[in-house]
Swiss-Prot record:
Free-text function comment from the UniProt entry: Regulatory subunit of the condensin-2 complex, a complex which establishes mitotic chromosome architecture and is involved in physical rigidity of the chromatid axis. Plays a role in the embryonic development of the head and kidney structures.
Residue stretches of each HEAT repeat: 460-493
Localization terms from the record: Nucleus
Keyword set includes Cell division: yes
Gene3D superfamilies (alphabetical): Leucine-rich Repeat Variant (1.25.10.10)
Cell division recorded as keyword: yes
Organism this protein belongs to: Danio rerio (Zebrafish)
Oligomeric and partner information: Component of the condensin-2 complex, which contains the smc2 and smc4 heterodimer, and three non SMC subunits that probably regulate the complex: ncaph2, ncapd3 and ncapg2.
Domain of life of the source: Eukaryota
Disulfide bonds, paired cysteine numbers: none
Matches recorded under InterPro entries: ARM-like, ARM-type_fold, Condensin2_G2
Protein name in the entry: Condensin-2 complex subunit G2
Primary localisation category: nucleus
Length: 1140
């Protein structure tokens, strides 16, 4: 019996196993049995018999094991229960698989006159059960779906139902899978299925959301198959087009710019393929809507640039048939109107669209009408360049340049010349807007991309040369960018547009963004890497002699445009040049005899040319610093370079003795390791010792940095310590013996001021400070101790001893530096409180030794010195807290110190500094997490607010005692008081700190304003304040500070309201004072609610008060009452008007 006959017989429920064996053989690639060959050999009747038999087999299998009894994935995965799948279900799954395979092969083998009704029934049965298959049968589901897909492709009867199933599955997969490329291809091939489903039907509504989700997916939008599918969706239903468009608009802000171009392509494809009502809908609902958005959206909108990108894609398709006509028709009702809009941003947006789509015309019009339309549009370009708004003019400049670049060949030459002259001669010099000038230079690059423009541009561009010196940096950047474009496009000689002299002058003085571009422009001229290295050096010398400042700038940025190896080569060739100059200077007879063989450099340069020598040395340092990291990374190159310069540097130091040469030589030495210059260290230290007090920073800065880079900073510290110790006014017994060091330079003059200058320089610069603080404590403690000793001289001066002014100044500086050094050391070594205790001892010393002179000073000199000492101590302590070095104990110690200062007779003179210290204490308290320390922190805040109240009282007292001095004190305290009140933003409105601070301020202001009112003896003396300056000095100062910050003003008004509600204010003069405060605050046009509430409360209380004493009131009280009520009414009316 043949295989064909055996297979046909096996398709029966009684021979199921044989059937399954044949299916297994078909799936086995190594076996020759192939169902496709078997079906191809079957006669028509045999194929019909096969389909009938397999239908019955499938029906029998589903009767034996119906889908309702199948064990699904839920049961298979159920907890700890083991669910066994029956033999019947296993066999049924195998039969379904076999039937699916036979059906799929049969679809491919169908012939024209075949009756495939039973095959269709079989496929429909599979369609009915595919969704009920267990999760483990996913491959079987996929095989069934493939059968339906093949059915659709063959365009067989019943394809709609089967194709819909396949379409839904593919759609779901493309939305859910991370990499849906293959599914996208299948979905695209099945897209026509969608047209068989009505949009309004249940099936149609079922797929709307998944279809719209496709527009969220970047994979769909970018892939070719995805674009085809998404563009096809526009042809399903006109209502669906609007839904698609709204979905895309909502997603545009989240799309990257690169994706917007693909979205534009989808729109364009949809438009190209659409016709009839679909075309009308796409044009009106989508394209024209995008046009409207591009015109009306703000430029800072996240969507605007994406909408512009989509329309730009359409504009670039103008060469395609029908695009020009469509753009002309859709722009007509919106664009020309927008170009004349009153809103400048709309006009600017319209300008960009108009120039991008230029020329906008209908190809179906006659040539005469087209010419007329284009001429009108050219006239419009000129009008836009003259627009009164800079934003529109800038947009017009960009647009005109893009039009000229695209349409140079078709625009009349006279019009081109007029437009370019407008840009270059007028708008490039637009004094009203740097943005317009910047646009001209940036957009010239667009025109230069068209080579046809070069001859005319070469004639016109030199008129722009003065723009290199424009007052706006961004204009200068754009101008140099234009020169770079001219050079790259070879449109003209850039030095004919702007001379080399001007470029070098601007390079010398300009900022990095401009100078870097100038270096790029001139790089090949002064650093021609394709020529011999000697030429590099010659160009370097030429640049130095032309403009030394520009030369330094040029080589500062040269590393950006060449390899580090070339920079090192230039350094070495400059070294060689210097060596030759030195050699020639030492052997003049040899130099003169060898003149015929001398190079150009040897003829130009000589050691006596100090300026050129110094410039070459400076450039060496600049070049080395620019490639220092690269050199360090290549140790072989580093060792070679340091060896070369290490051998030459001692000779340079010997020959080049001029001051200008010494600085770069020291810097060059600092870049070399100390081992390369063993003899130089002593010379450097000798230089530091030889300087005189008051020497300029430039004379020692490089030397200090050089020693730091060598790791020799300990020698500087030792020198400073020796000078301070030897010049110290009081030497403890055994000090010199206890140092354990022998000093050979004790006969030298001590220079403590210069030592303090060195210390100041090292503490201020991060690099030197880091080096200083890396020293071990054993080397830092002697310096710390030496600084501390100078306190005794301050006390001696206060005690009446004769001390020179210079010595006092030195002692005061040493006292300050002692505090500064303590801060750095405590921050570096926070484990213990050694240096914090030292600061506490200094504070205690001030209290014990200095504060008595604030109580009773016999001379102005004593008072001035004691005040300076206290202020210096307070400033140091403030900085301790500012850098978070102090702890709670230190903070409490400082509060006690502030209280002690305020109790002295002249302590008020330190109030500005004390307020600054209180600010840092308050900030620390309010920002501290008081876990387990709530009581201590609360006590500290209470003491703080009491001290602040004392400060306010002292200010009021000084004003009463000496008005002029009090006013000066208020003015000097204003900034510190402002900073103190800003700390209140770190706390809640009704906190203990807030209440304490603002209750003191409110009371002070009310008392200060009401006191003059109580002294009025005549009605004419009553004056109403108009500004804060009309108030008494203390209240004026407090309100100025309060009104400087809305949050502080709100806290002040809150406390004022609480005082009124508590009825703590009970006199007509105090209510008048409150009204004066409200009158001043209302001028800010803010705090309407607070002002209205307070004014209402005051009016009620003052009315009740006056009703009770009106019979006994005198004329002055009545006048104060009437003026107060009038001001209150003005405040309330003002609040009402502001609300309206």
């Amino acid at each position: 019996m043949s295989k064909r006959k055996q297979f046909l017989d096996s398709v029966h429920h009684e021979h199921v196993q044989d059937f399954l064996n044949f299916i297994k053989l078909h799936k086995d690639g190594a076996d020759p049995f192939d169902l496709a060959e078997i079906l191809a050999e079957l006669q028509k009747s045999q194929r019909q018999d096969l389909w009938d038999r397999q239908l019955k087999l499938l029906q029998h299998s589903l009767t034996v094991s119906p889908s309702e009894r199948w064990i699904t994935g839920a049961e298979e995965d159920a907890g700890d229960m083991e669910v066994e799948v029956s033999e019947e279900q296993i066999q049924t799954m195998a039969v379904i698989e076999g039937v699916t395979i036979v059906s799929t092969v049969s679809v491919d083998a169908l012939q024209e006159k075949d009756n495939y009704t039973t095959l269709l029934k079989c496929a429909q049965m599979l369609n009915a059960i595919e969704s009920a298959l267990p999760l483990s049968q996913t491959p079987l589901q996929q095989a069934i779906h493939w059968l339906f897909e093949c059915w659709w492709r063959r365009d067989l009867q019943g394809k709609e139902e089967l194709g819909w199933t396949a379409f839904l599955v593919c759609l779901e997969n493309t939305v859910t899978l991370d990499k849906p490329v293959s599914e996208l291809r299948r979905l695209c091939s099945l897209r026509e299925v969608l047209l068989s489903v009505d949009f309004g039907s249940e099936k149609g509504q079922q797929v709307i959301d998944p279809l719209l989700q496709c527009f969220f997916r970047a994979s769909h939008i970018k892939q070719e198959e995805g674009k085809r599918f998404l563009a096809f969706l526009f042809s399903w239903n006109d209502n669906f087009i609007r839904m698609i468009h709204e979905t895309i608009k909502n997603q545009l802000q989240f799309f990257p710019k690169t994706l917007s171009v693909h979205v534009a392509e989808i729109y364009f494809r949809a438009w190209r393929k659409a016709s009839g009502p679909f075309l009308e809908e796409i044009e009106s609902a989508c394209i024209q809507d995008l046009m409207q958005h591009a015109l009306l959206l703000h430029r800072n909108s996240p969507v605007h640039s994406k909408v512009r990108q989509i329309l730009t894609y359409f504009h670039k398709q103008k060469f395609r048939e029908g695009v020009d006509e469509m753009l002309h028709r859709l722009y007509k009702p919106v664009l020309w109107k927008a170009l004349k809009a009153t809103n400048a941003e709309v006009r600017a947006n319209a300008t960009l669209l108009f120039t991008e789509a230029f020329p906008i015309h209908d190809p179906n019009m006659s040539s005469e009408m087209v010419d007329q339309a284009v001429q009108k549009q050219l006239d419009l370009l000129f009008a836009l360049l003259d627009d009164p708004q800079p934003l529109v003019r800038s947009s017009a400049v960009l647009g005109v340049c893009s039009v000229l670049a695209r349409c140079w060949e078709v625009i009349p030459s006279a019009v081109i010349t007029d437009l370019l002259e407008k840009l270059i001669l007028q708008l490039a010099n637009d004094t009203s807007s740097p943005d317009v000038r910047c646009s001209v230079f940036m957009c010239m690059s667009i025109i230069l991309d068209n080579s046809l423009s070069h001859p005319l541009m070469e004639k016109l561009l030199p008129a722009l040369k003065s723009s290199l010196h424009d007052s706006s940096e961004k204009v200068r950047v754009a101008f140099v960018g234009m020169l770079l474009k001219i050079k790259a496009a070879r449109a003209a000689k850039f030095w004919k547009v702007c001379s080399l002299e001007h470029l070098l002058a601007r390079l010398e003085m300009d900022s990095a963004p401009v100078s870097k571009r100038i270096v790029n422009l001139l790089f090949n001229s002064f650093f021609p890497v394709n020529q011999p290295e000697t030429v590099w050096c010659e160009r370097c010398v030429t640049l130095i002699q032309t403009n030394p400042g520009a030369a330094r700038k040029f080589y500062q940025h040269a590393y950006l445009y060449t390899a580090p190896a070339n920079i090192v080569k230039l350094m070495l060739v400059i070294r060689k040049c210097l060596n030759v100059c030195i050699q020639n200077a030492g052997d003049e007879e040899f130099a003169s005899s060898n003149k015929e063989n001398s190079t150009l450099l040897e003829d130009v340069l000589s050691v006596q040319d100090t300026s050129s020598m110094a410039s070459l040395l400076e450039i060496l340092v600049i070049l080395w610093k620019s490639v220092q990291k690269s050199l360090m990374a290549n140790q072989e190159a580093f060792k070679y370079t340091t060896a070369k310069f290490g051998s030459s540097l001692p000779q340079y130091l010997k020959i080049f003795q001029e001051e200008r040469c010494k600085a770069p030589l020291i810097l060059l030495a600092s870049l070399l390791p100390a081992s390369a210059l063993p003899a130089l260290r002593s010379k450097v230290m000798s230089h530091l010792r030889s300087l005189k007090a008051g020497a300029a920073v430039t004379t020692y800065s490089q030397t200090l940095e050089c020693l730091c880079s060598w790791g020799q900073i300990s020698h500087i510290v030792e020198l400073i310590e020796n000078w301070l110790t030897e010049a110290a006014p009081v030497k403890e017994q055994g000090d010199e013996e206890s140092t354990g060091k022998v000093h050979f330079d004790v006969l030298e003059e001590s220079k403590p001021d210069l030592g303090l200058d060195y210390l100041d320089y090292m503490l201020l610069r991060p690099k030197t400070r880091e080096c200083l603080l890396t020293l071990p404590l054993d080397q830092m403690r002697p310096l710390h101790k030496a600084l501390n000793k100078w306190k005794s001289l301050l006390f001696s001066s206060l005690s009446g001893s004769e001390v020179s002014v210079a010595a006092i100044e030195t002692a005061l500086r040493a006292f300050i530096f002692h505090g500064r050094l303590c801060i750095h050391l405590q921050h570096k070594f926070p484990e213990e409180r050694e240096f914090l205790k030292s600061l506490e001892h200094s504070v205690s010393w001030v209290e014990k030794r200095v504060l008595p002179f604030l109580v009773n000073s016999s001379s102005d000199q004593q008072l001035s010195l004691s005040t300076k000492i206290v202020e210096s101590c307070v400033t140091v302590c403030k900085n301790v807290l500012r850098v978070s070095v102090g702890d709670s104990d230190f903070r409490d110690h400082l509060l006690q110190h502030v209280a002690s200062v305020l109790q002295t007779e002249k302590g008020y003179m330190c109030i500005p500094h004390l307020l600054a210290l209180l600010t840092e204490i308050a900030h620390g308290c309010l920002s501290q997490k008081a876990e387990g320390q709530e009581d201590q922190l609360s006590l500290t805040i209470r003491i703080l607010t009491n001290i602040f109240q004392k400060v306010v009282e002292i200010l009021a007292h000084r004003l009463r005692k000496d008005k002029e001095e009090g006013q000066e004190l208020c003015c000097s305290s204003e900034e510190a008081l402002h900073d103190f009140l800003l700390v209140t933003k770190f706390t809640s409105e009704r906190s203990e700190f807030m209440t304490g601070v603002f209750s003191s301020l409110c009371a002070a202001v009310i008392i200060d304003i009401s006191r003059p009112l109580q002294k009025i003896s005549h009605v004419e003396e009553l004056l109403m304040p108009e500004t804060v300056n009309d108030l008494p000095p203390l209240s004026s100062t407090i309100l100025k500070v309060t009104l400087g910050c809305p949050a502080v003003t709100r806290f002040f008004l809150s406390e004022l309201s609480s005082s009124i509600e508590s009825e703590a204010i009970d006199s007509i003069t105090q209510w008048a004072a409150v009204t004066h405060i409200l009158t001043i605050i209302k001028e800010s046009d803010a705090f309407i609610v607070e002002l209205k509430d307070i004014a209402g409360s005051v009016r009620r209380q003052i009315q009740n008060y006056y009703n009770s004493i009106s019979e006994n009131s005198d004329d002055i009280q009545r006048t104060i009452y009437e003026s107060t009520v009038k001001m209150l009414n003005d405040v309330l009316i003002s609040c009402q008007q502001t609300n309206n």
